[in-house]
Amino acid sequence: MINELTIKGLKCFDEVEFSFENLTLLAGKNSLGKSTVIQALLAMIQEGKNPFRGQYINIGRISELKNKYVGSKEIEITVNHKFVRRMTDDKNEVISEGKLSDEISVRYLSADRIGVRDTYEIALDNPDRIGVRCEYAYQYLAMHDSDKWENNPLVFDQRSKLTFGGQVDYWLER
């Protein structure tokens, strides 16, 4: 579980530390950094030369994302005081200590969704995923439709059908 996140020099942040609980809500006015917190977490699990450009997010070059108001020379993101990623555009360098994606499982669903289609893609490489833009949602639903959900804490009404598909139907009909 992610308990603490420290962000230095990224966008609106000079240096800030967040503590997380089992359920954490990010709320506030526009342009206060809510999206930046999510982007920092995604940058920690995204692979490549620029962790801000890839599968989960594509928000720009490191030089564009540094906090210009305080003259940040680098961006540093730390999770749980254990996993660190430092990025500088001077040498186009990313230095990582530890690999967060080995410790936690992330299912990120972007607010940007694909529209209605006549057909939907199939994930051949990993059929047990939904896709960042929910492009494999129908495949995932079909694969897990009859998965048993007895004694699952996510079940709201025990009188509903206690399968994954039954729970999806229950919430879509509400």
Predicted regions: what they are:
Residues 1-42:
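Pre-Walker A-like glycine/lysine-rich segment at the N-terminus of P-loop NTPase domains
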Residues 47-174:
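Phosphate-coordinating catalytic segments in nucleotide- and nucleic-acid-processing enzymes
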